[in-house]
């Protein structure tokens, strides 16, 4: 039988809370040491208890060294993000270079290779641009096709509904025409009846005649 999820909440009993803290803290530090040994990872853990007592672990060197490494790595990431933000002049220069490359690539593609010499780096950059363009073109084409298919399905549904309405109207009109023809026939004195047999032979009469004939031959009278 599967066990349900246990809801995590604060342990109200202070003794139980302290015992759980000690056990979980020891398990966490043990797992950190094992991870450091197995994967050669540098791990630093800082824990403050509810009473403000400090517990820390540095698997490599000291905690101060790990903190300095953390600050240095965080600063490099922040600088990298800041470097990505170019000023308008640099951005305009980059765009101008891209435009020149694309114009040069177009001339090269359309056969003007004698006058336009492109390096391997320029050709690689042009190839990347072309791949991006092809992806965008295919995406736009697929979106248009999906929209057209949805429009056709919508029109198909509308045509089916209109066809059903027309069929219902045709059935109603045919019923009215049949009723009108029957009324007209009755007014003109024409009735459609099943032809009756003028003469129907009674089987009892045949049987009675046969019996009288046989009785006379044998000397009996009826």
From Swiss-Prot:
**Keyword Nucleus: yes or no?**
yes
Can you give the residue ranges of the K-box domain? 85-176
Q: Where in the cell is it found?
A: Nucleus
InterPro entries in alphabetical order: MADS-box/MEF2_TF, MEF2-like_N, TF_Kbox, TF_MADSbox, TF_MADSbox_sf
Biological process, per Gene Ontology: positive regulation of transcription by RNA polymerase II; regulation of transcription by RNA polymerase II
Q: Which SUPFAM superfamilies match?
A: SRF-like
| Annotated keywords | DNA-binding, Nucleus, Transcription, Transcription regulation
By what name is this protein known? MADS-box transcription factor 26
Organism this protein belongs to: Oryza sativa subsp. japonica
């Amino acid at each position: 039988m599967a066990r349900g999820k246990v809801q995590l909440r604060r342990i109200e009993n202070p003794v139980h809370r302290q015992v759980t803290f000690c056990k979980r803290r020891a398990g966490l530090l043990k797992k950190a040491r094992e991870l450091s040994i197995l994967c050669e990872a540098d791990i630093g853990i800082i824990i403050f208890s509810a009473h403000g007592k400090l517990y820390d672990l540095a698997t490599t060197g000291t905690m101060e060294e790990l903190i300095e490494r953390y600050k240095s790595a965080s600063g490099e990431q922040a600088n990298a993000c800041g470097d990505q933000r170019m000023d308008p002049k640099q951005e305009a220069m980059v765009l101008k270079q891209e435009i020149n490359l694309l114009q040069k690539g177009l001339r090269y593609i359309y056969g003007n290779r004698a006058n336009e010499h492109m390096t391997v780096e320029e050709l690689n950059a042009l190839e990347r641009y072309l791949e991006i363009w092809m992806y965008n073109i295919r995406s736009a084409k697929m979106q248009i096709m999906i929209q057209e298919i949805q429009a056709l399905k919508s029109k198909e549904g509308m045509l089916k509904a209109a066809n059903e309405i027309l069929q219902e109207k045709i059935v109603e009109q045919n019923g009215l025409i049949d009723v009108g023809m029957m009324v007209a026939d009755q007014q003109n004195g024409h009735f459609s009846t099943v032809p009756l047999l003028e003469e129907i032979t009674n089987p009892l009469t045949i049987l009675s005649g046969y019996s009288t004939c046989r009785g006379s031959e044998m000397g009996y009278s009826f």
